[in-house]
Amino acid sequence: MRTAIVGAGLQGNRRASALRLSDGDGLLLVADIDPEAAQRLAQEYGCRATRRWQDVIEAEEVEAVLICTPPHLHASIAVAALRRGKHVLCEKPLGRNPGEARRMIDAAQESGVTIKCGLNHRHHPAIRQAKLWCDEGQIGEIMFIRSRHGIAGREGYDREWRARGEISGGGELIDQGVHGLDLARWFLGEFSECFAFLSSSYWEMGPLEDNAFALLRTSGGQVASLHASWTEWRNLFSFEVFGREGYVKVEGLNGSYGTERAVLGRRSPSAPFRERVIEFRGEDRSWAEEWREFVEAVAEGREPLGSGRDGLMASRLTQALYESARTGRAVTPEDLA
């Protein structure tokens, strides 16, 4: 699929690499307000560069757009691309709020094209294995989920665009917490009640949180707890699902998060406790797998895994948790839709 990337920073480079791994020579154009950044990435992949994202929209040969900009630009770029009949994969969060995400979905539906939210964690092999075990009924009915995702930040983190709410839409909850919210919803379904505490423990970013603590409950009483942190000091990813007959755990994402592995534990009162462990070593191919599945979804005319609606629902949960933290009360996401 003939593709353009808007945003030549860390995520733009990561997405370009993933595109090459999964789609050959499909990158035609790179746009970034920093012309040197755009040119560097374009030279590496043998394509054209521009500093105007509007040039991407106007390029008739471009079939799909990868949006890798800060969140405040997501909606305007995506809506323009979708209205010109281009498919879009937009980095998370889909929008700074549900209204922006809704505009993108409406534009896609009106034009008959595909909008996808960048939720690459769904494509980590350990996550996929854990989901398979749950779907097979290996741990019985799910009772609760515990999700932890933490990074250390870096020098000057509080001076990056993430520290400006008008650009980012929020702090750690909307940045990394979105992944845990999306996975919890993928495993459990819709949540009817949300409660959150937010704190700024270390990074001086005004009203924005560097730690988010959340509890979410389904109408059936299943609970997900989530902690997303910019003060973990050593990168950590842990996603645990507990059922009536056992549990599954995902630990690590490779690289700085440690070896990625999926663990299945079965409850057996009459026998020695046993775990099955599968390790997934090597480079992180979740970005390439996400792009490959997106291309297949477009070709097959179906919703991709991590669809625009999934991005919208993650945005609604995020908004509900921010409202809960503000008011000190549990919030029903549907009331804010």
Regions picked out by a protein language model, each given a short descriptive name:
Residues 15, 45-107:
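Beta-loop-alpha module in the N-terminal Rossmann-like domain of NAD(P)-dependent dehydrogenases
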Residues 64-67, 295-337:
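C-terminal helix-rich "cap/oligomerization" subdomain common to oxidoreductases
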Residues 106-114, 128-143, 243, 247:
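Basic phosphate/pyrophosphate-binding loop/patch that engages nucleotide-derived ligands
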Residues 182-256, 288-301, 337:
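Contiguous beta-strand/loop segments that form the cofactor/metal-binding neighborhood of enzyme cores
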